[in-house]
Amino acid sequence: MTTESTSESKTKTETETETETEQRNDLSNSSNSSEDASCPGSSPVSTESDPDNDDTSVSANTIVRQYIESAAESVGALWPIHSFVTANPLSGFEDQPFHKAVAAGATRFGGDGYPDSDVFEHAWKTGQINQEILKKTLDEYETDHTPASAIAAIDSGTQATSGRDTGVRMGTGVDDEINNWDEIDKRVIKWLSAFLDAGSAEWEMPNRGSGFYTAFQSVATYDTMIPDTDLIEDPPADPIDAVSTVLASYPRSQWSEIIEAQITALPGWTGLICYRTENETAWQTAYPITLVGYLAARMMLADALSIPLDSISRPAHSVTSTEESTADIETYPLQEIILIAWERTYREELIEQIADTADNHKHEHDHDHDADKTIGDDVEPQADSRSSSVRPDAQLVFCIDTRSEIIRRHIESTGQYETYGYAGFFGIPMRYRGYDDAVSIDACPPIVDAQHRISESAKHADENKTPNGQYNSRYERIRDIYDAGIDIVDSLASNVTTAFNFVETTGSGYGVGLALRTLFPQRVYDILTRIENRLPRIDVISQPQLNTATGEVNQYSHNETDGSHSEDVLPYGLTHQERVEYAASAFELMGLKTFGRVVGFIGHASQTANNPFGSSLDCGACAGNAGGPSARVLAQICNDDAVKTSLRDRGIDIPVDTVFIAGEHTTTTDKITLYTEAIPDSHQDDIRSLQADLSIAQEDAAAERLESLSGDTTVDAIQDIERRAADWAETRPEWGLAGNAGFVIGPRRLTDDVDLEGRVFLHSYDWQQDETGSALESILTGPLIVTQWINAQYYFATVDTAVYGSGSKVTQNPVGNVGIYQGNGGDLMRGLPVQSVRKSTDNLYHQPIRLSTVVHAPVSKVTHALADLESVTELLDNNWISLTVIDPTRENDAFHYVKGLKWLPHGEGYKHDATECISPQINQTVSSSSD
């Protein structure tokens, strides 16, 4: 890629220039932090002075940097569209109670934080909000409302907060200045989009290698949209000095508000800048940009346009009475209270289903436990089996993704199969490069740093002497031709300048292609499938190279630096001990102790056409990438005889006839592709039987999902979902994770008889095999956090698709391979499109409720795990998620997390209507406050 050569030739980055100048000019402060620290997740800048104090002994640059860092906390990172991560758009406010966070979001971004009255009314009338639960919740929060009057109050806009306090309508008072704001935005956006382009532009912005601040100066002087370019021609060398110079005209008491307003004016673009600085990609190394440089450009533009910064101290967004700030008193908006009742209604149903299933299995499980002991002293009882005394036909491990719940249920119904749930990166934090990929990807959650580099290479290098070599040659010829065509089309289609006249300039040939995709998408799918089938499967021609020798890399990975990551110093491959640890961790977290003849790790990916948000449908645990590579790596590890030997020393005895395979579940079509090249002849019948049953499961799952997509049960389900996958005009190829509402952590037997409607994340866990609680802690700090991100993204994209989502797909345009905007310009959109959450304009599909988590374990064990997990308890205490424990040591009784590591027994209410709660860590009953 272009970034490689640019990165090597670049002599001085913007960050280096800014840091050196700061050290020269800011001698009064000992901190040498770079501007990258102003984004969330970076090290904070320590200060000893109050920045709001006008004491001039405190360096202006120091104060500016503090304010930038503080403002950046409210703008979460925005991942590029090619690897879009569904994250919480209000992640910067998770240290606040939910109702205060949405009020802050309304003030800063103008976004609605709660469903509107029509949504609540529909949920109430359809039973999604139970009337009795709503009544109890309204009483609990001390309102004067009945259920009917509460819904009516929202509809009329006369809501009151809890505690019988009414709010005061707030406004920003800056409506007259909205044009000034737009004048700055449209100029800075023009140069941001040019600078941050990730390979789609035919002509690059000049001087990008010098950094955004310098590049902006070089072009702004020729920008006819800027009336007074003299103010930009000779600015300070360091952008921090430029910011301080502009701010010097204002009292220091106003600096914080001015900086926050400028940083949050375009949260999409600033979120992308934060992503770049936090992840230090090759694009960032080659073309550096910081929030300080961006802020300097904005402020210089305001100066050149003669726009006073104190007149645009906040975006022109009004804040409704339902989202007012409650900073001084602990009150709850009525929407919050009704939302809680909605969530409790769902949670009650989920807990009842799980508890009933747990009770039904209890005696069966006890019987199986005794039966297992008679099989042999070396056989452990298996918690996740329907019948542990019968060896399963196969065991399949899926991602915890809600879409896996549907296919798992249908697979289990076709035979003696066991399915498990595990994070879709299968516990291996790697940077992965496929056999024919030009760049590598981080195949791990965004909250986890990659630890290893793994690349694929050809199984047989001598293509003239081996069948696999012939496969490689044919594969590469076809793939090169295909990729060349795709690159040309993508370059034209994704460039704003060329997109609108693309079809005209490419002539009738492309028009025929568009017509075929529009009129005959099923035929197109069939043709593409036949072409794909002529190519050898990737597992036939290549395999992941796990050896630590750096020489074993593919033809594309001869450089340490690739097009996606800079100066990559990650070690190649995995040591033997690392392989053992990753395999053992997977089995221990899932509670998998006994094995069938075939054990499969099934990643997942999507298949869509003309979909900028396609990566949002891929595996979130793989950072918006396909999960197949992660599955292949873990399967290869587990088939290693040396690894199996070491696992036996740890009490994990894998039978000699157990074979591990990998696969990939295409969630759009529910097709599961198995990678079976390494399967011995002795297991071919097992594989054929499994593949036949997977085809049956696909048909059943497709029929179930199609009903929710179209409601038409008369069409062929397989044909229709294949059409959706190939139809370039299809705005809703699948629902993705829409509908997600719950997360169950426990053995499959809790839910195997329950239709969870594809709304629940399922992570396998056996508390009896987790003596130290470390497995539970790993699940709570990893998968739970990721699912909360996903849930929050869907929630906010549903309640305000214009601010927290991305509006309609029909009017979206891609920008420089980094994002999308509505129409022909503006801020980068930060969330999912309306088609991902709504059936129609007036008909929601996704129910906007927060995540209800259920853990099957002793409440004391969960309390112990939470005690040191501040990041998790913060989400719980601030009502971003809820937690219920089903305690198997107490006859599967349920306990709801209250606050401060305290619990209330199910049936005794949740908070205010209960007089006592238990504190398991001290094994006694203690008095609890009402909150």
Curated annotation (Swiss-Prot):
Highest taxon, organism lineage: Archaea
Membrane topology value: Peripheral membrane protein
Residues annotated for Zn(2+) binding in this entry: 399, 401, 604, 619
Subcellular localization, as worded in the UniProt entry: Cell membrane
Residue spans crossing the bilayer: none
This protein's GO CC annotations: plasma membrane
GO molecular function ontology, one term from the record: zinc ion binding
Cofactor dependence: Zn(2+)
Basic and acidic residues bias locations: 7-25, 360-376
Assembly and oligomerization: Forms a complex with DabB.
Entry function: Part of an energy-coupled inorganic carbon pump.
HAMAP family referenced in this protein's UniProt entry, alphabetically: DabA
Protein name, UniProt field: Probable inorganic carbon transporter subunit DabA
Source organism (scientific name): Haloquadratum walsbyi (strain DSM 16790 / HBSQ001)
Gene this protein is translated from: dabA
